[in-house]
Amino acid sequence: GIIPQPDWRKKESIQVFGEPRLGFLVSAGNMDSMVNHYTVSKKHRQKDSYSPGGQMGLRPDRAVIVYSNLIRQTYKKTPIILGGIEASLRRLAHYDYWENKVKHSVLLDSGADMISYGMGEHSIIEIAEALDSGLSIQDITYIPGTVCKVKSLDSVYEPTILPSYEQLKEDKLNYARSFYVQY
């Protein structure tokens, strides 16, 4: 089922269907929540064109982080996969305009297990098939177009190694090299 714009202040809002069989797919919607809420001058917008009646305040800032943490508080072990523009743009260490600093992957702040980035219509099917076959979310490290957390690179097929978050924060040239590899 789809739970559009759940109330992030009430965990009951994400419990309407009970625990899903395969996992939760979380998106901030068709527009990044920060871009939707603030102008380039960092002034708060008055209208949310993607909410009923243009009402502002129906979704939080950094929605994928907030929604995913809400789910994780309630469903401790259920797989959570992030997707959409907000998660895709923040899938790895990234510059955050709103806080004027380099931040680590949204995967770490959100408590989610995986990100399906870009046009995820193929990768999300592969993820669902893998989960349906009985694979643990921690073992799904081989699907192109995904980012996942692992304790050891031994379980990752052909990993792409990027500079650490600390290296990116301290050196703009490392940040540029990492960005180049990503794209």
Pin down the residues of each PLM region:
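Glycine-rich beta-alpha loop elements in corrinoid/cobalamin-binding modules
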Residues: 4-183
